[in-house]
C-alpha cells in the first residue's frame, strides 16, 4: 500500500498554527485542551493522534514542553513518559525520510567523502539501520526527557529538515568509518572491512555502550565551517590581564565554544581590576546561548587561594542564583593544607604580580617562595578558621571543585608543567598560554554484565563472578580498545578539518574515558556501594580500562602513527606507567602484560598522553538512562525552565482560550529508580510515604530477605564518609585525570574534615558536589507524595528536585 505523503513543516516561527486548536500560536502544540490530570489520562489516544500529525522533532519538543507543564497534576506520568518516548520516533523524519536519502540530498551540508561512503555502501547501510533501529526502539530508545535532550543539544537542519537520532548516528558512523579507512595506522589495527567497522559502530552508538559528546554528534561529518568544534570542553590558560586581551580571546575561542555547546573554563583570579567585568560578560553570553540555541553550557571559574581577589570571588559565589550554571574551583597549594587545621594560623593573600609569580612555581618551590614573600612583601591576612568557614559555606551551595596542587604535581605524567588549570574537573594539559582541550567519551559499564561465560575464559582476568552474574572484562577491554581508536579518529578529523580548538589537542591528544552506570552494576548484583567486593570491582574496572587505553595507544605508534608531541617530556618516555607512582598497588592483570607494555612504551611511544577520568559528562548521561558518574544517589533530571510554560485553565476542561502563565518558577521533579520499583512493586505505596528512604522503613513490614535487598538501595547519606572515600580511593592509581565525586553529608557532619581527608588520600581533583540532607529533602512533602515522572536505571533513591 502506498504510504501517504506528508508535508514537511518548515514554518518554525511565530506564523504557524497550533495543531490542537488551529489558532495562531508561538508553540506548535499549546496543550490548552489538556490542562487537567483526568483529561490527560483519558485522552492518551488523542495525544497519540496529534503526535501522528507532527512533522518534526522540533514539534515533539514543543509537545514535550506542554506535557511537562501539567505533570504535577498527573497521576499517569510514567505511562505518558514512555508513550511520548515511543512516539518521538514517529515524529522524526526516520519514518518519512530514510536517513541515507536525507544525507545524500544535502551535498551542501555533508562532507563529500561522507557522501561518497554512503553512496557506495547504501544498501548495506539500510540493512544495518533497520536491524539496530528495531533493537533501539525495544530497549534503548530514550523517553521524553532523553529525547528532548537530543532536541536541545543537536539542532542541525539539513535543507529545512531536522536530523533525527538515526540520521545523526548514520552521519557519525559513516564519518568515523571513512576516517579509519583513510588513516593507515587505524586501518592496520582494525584489520576489518568497512562493513564490519560500520556495523560495529552503529550497534555501539544505538545501544549506547559508549557515547561521544554532543558537540561531536552535532558537527562530525558536516561541511567545514568557521568556529565549529567536536570537543565539549575548552580551557583557557592565560597570562593576559587586560579586558582588551580577554575580548580578543573571547571572540576567537570562548564564545564560539559556547555556541557549540562546549563547557568553558578559565582562571579569572589573574585578572584583577577587570575580573568582575569579565565574569559578567561570560554570564551574559551563557544566557544568550541557552536562550537562542537551546544548548546547555557551563562555566568553570578557577580561583587561586593565595590571590587577594579570592575572598571577593568566594563572596560572589555565595550570592549567585542556585540555577546558574557556574562552578567554582579552588586551586589549593600544599602549604595551605599544612596550615589548615592549625589553631590560630593565618593565611596570606598576595596582590597581582606576587600572586602570579607564585602561580608559576612548581609545588617544590611554592612553599619556599610563599614564606619568602610573606616576610618581604606587603600582603593581606586572614585567619585560617575564617577562610575555611567561607570555603565550607560555598561548598554547601554545591557545584564547587577542589584542585590539590601538590597532588597534581606529584602524580602528573608531565613533570614541571602546571596541570592544575583543567576543565570540568579534568586536569587537561595547559602546556601553553591559550586554549587547551580534551576529547571525552562516556562508557556505560552496565553493558558488561552477563549471565554466562565461555569455558575458554580465565576467571579474574576475563571475567569475575558476582553472585548470579558475571562481569565480562574481556568484552570491556575489546570495547575500550575501539573507543581509543575512535577517539584518535575524531582527533585526526579535528586537526585535518581545522577545528578551531585543534591547537588545544595536538600536543597531548588527551582523551578521557568517563565511567558511568557503575552503581547500576552494584544494584543488579546485590552489592551495597561501599561493600569490599564493590570496591574491588571498581578498582579492576579502572585497571583494565587504563591498561587497554595505553596498550592501544602504543599499538597506534607501532602501526606507523607518530607519538604525541608531549611524549618526550613525559614520564612515559622513561618507561613509567601512571600507577608506578603509587605504593603497594594491587594489580589483577598478569605482571608480564605490564612488563611488556612498559618496554613497548619506551621503544615506540604513546599516541595519547591522558586516558581515563573518573568524572562526569553532565549532558550526555541522560540519553543512556544512567547517572552522571559513580555515586550512590541520583541527581540527573534537569529541565530547562526557559521553554516550559504552565497552562492555566479557566472554567471548562476543554476551554481553548486557556492562556499561558508567566515562565515556570518552580517545578518538582520526582525521579524514580526502576530497579527498586520492580523488586518492591507490592510495597510501592508504602515506600512513597517514607520518600523511598530505605533506612526509614518499618522493618516489621518486610521479611529479612527483603530488608537485605533494600540495603542495596541506601542513599548516599546512609554511608559513612570514610567508606565512600575508600570506594573512590580504590581506583586512584589508574585514573590519570581528575576524579570528581558527590559527597553526602548529614547535618551532624562537619565539612571541615573532608578537605584534609581528600588531600591525604591523594585526590588531585575532587568535590564535584556536596549535598546536605536537610537541603536535599527540604522540598519533599511526604504527606502529599508526588507522581513519578522519569525513568532511570541508575541511582538509589527517589527524590524531588526543585527548579527555581
UniProtKB/Swiss-Prot annotation:
Subcellular location: Virion; Host cytoplasm
A matching Pfam family: Ribonuc_red_lgC
GO molecular function: ATP binding; ribonucleoside-diphosphate reductase activity, thioredoxin disulfide as acceptor
A biological-process GO annotation: deoxyribonucleotide biosynthetic process
PROSITE patterns documented for this protein: RIBORED_LARGE
Keyword annotations of the record: Host cytoplasm, Late protein, Virion
GO CC field: host cell cytoplasm; virion component
Matches recorded under Gene3D superfamilies: 3.20.70.20
Domain of life, per lineage: Viruses
Cited HAMAP family: HSV_RIR1_betahv
Function, in words: Does not possess a ribonucleotide reductase activity. Betaherpesviruses probably use another strategy to expand the dNTP pool in a quiescent host cell.
Family according to the record: Belongs to the ribonucleoside diphosphate reductase large chain family.
SUBUNIT field: The genome of human herpesvirus-6 does not code for a ribonucleotide reductase small subunit.
PANTHER family: RIBONUCLEOSIDE-DIPHOSPHATE REDUCTASE LARGE CHAIN, RIBONUCLEOSIDE-DIPHOSPHATE REDUCTASE LARGE SUBUNIT
The name this protein goes by in its record: Ribonucleoside-diphosphate reductase large subunit-like protein
Organism (species): Human herpesvirus 6B (strain Z29) (HHV-6 variant B)
Lineage, top ranks: Viruses, Duplodnaviria, Heunggongvirae, Peploviricota, Herviviricetes
